[in-house]
Each structure stands twice: as C-alpha cells, then as structure tokens.
Amino acid sequence: RDIAQGDCYLLYECGKPIATFVAKAGPEPNYHRIDNGSWLDDQPYYVIHRVASLEGVHGVMADIINYCSAFTSSIRIDTHADNRPMQASLIRLGFVYCGIIYVENGDSRLAFQRVF
C-alpha cells in the first residue's frame, strides 16, 4: 500500500539500494493519543515508518532525515522500546522523546519528534 500511495522510498549508494523507508504527511491516527508526555507542537508534520537497511549499512537515518527536512519542518517517528540503536540514532539526530503511543494491536511504542 505504501508503494501504491507513493510514500515508500529507497536510499541508494553507488547505484545499489541500501535502505527503504516510508515518509508521509500526518496526521497519523496512532499519534492522536500519547501517554506520559506530549508532542512538541500541534503543527503539520511528516511521519517516518518502516525504516530498514541492508545488514552492515550504518548511518542511513541521517540521510533519511536530511532528505525529509527538504519538504517538512517537523518529523514524528516511533520505535519499539527494545530498538536501542534506533533510539540512540534519533537522539543523536536531534529528536526529542515525547511519550508513548499505541499501534493498532495495542502494543506500545516510544514516540519522538524533531522540529527544524
């Protein structure tokens, strides 16, 4: 569905795809409720989902954020509590932990936002 809607992107290095992600304009239904915190603002934002990269490839989040910052001034993203590398990457890239959101099946995710 993300591909059909034009929201799925590939990141290339030397002509070879090394990562994929989804970036789409909010609002994100799962982000209406946030516990133990709040979003940084109520302005329009983009959401990044489903980030994946080839094994051994590092630093793609910086490239993804740089790309997305060309068309939005606010990005929201969530990640699993066990995904420590993603959390560290987000903090390093200037994201702020905002609270806990819940996905469709009720599982919790840590929510982050960066305003440029």
Where are the language model's segments positioned?
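Conserved GNAT-fold acetyl-CoA-binding loop/helix
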Residues: R1
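Conserved beta-hairpin
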Residues: G6-A23
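Conserved acyl-donor/pantetheine-binding loop and adjacent beta-alpha core of acyl/acetyltransferases
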Residues: V22-G56
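Charge-biased, low-complexity intrinsically disordered regions
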Residues: I48, M86, L110-A111
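Conserved acetyl-CoA-binding loop-helix of GNAT-fold acetyltransferases
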Residues: S53-A70, Q87-R92
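Conserved GNAT acetyl-CoA-binding A-motif
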Residues: A70-D82
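Conserved active-site alpha-helix within GNAT-family acetyltransferase domains
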Residues: A81-I100, E104
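C-terminal "cap" of GNAT-fold acetyltransferases
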Residues: V103-F116
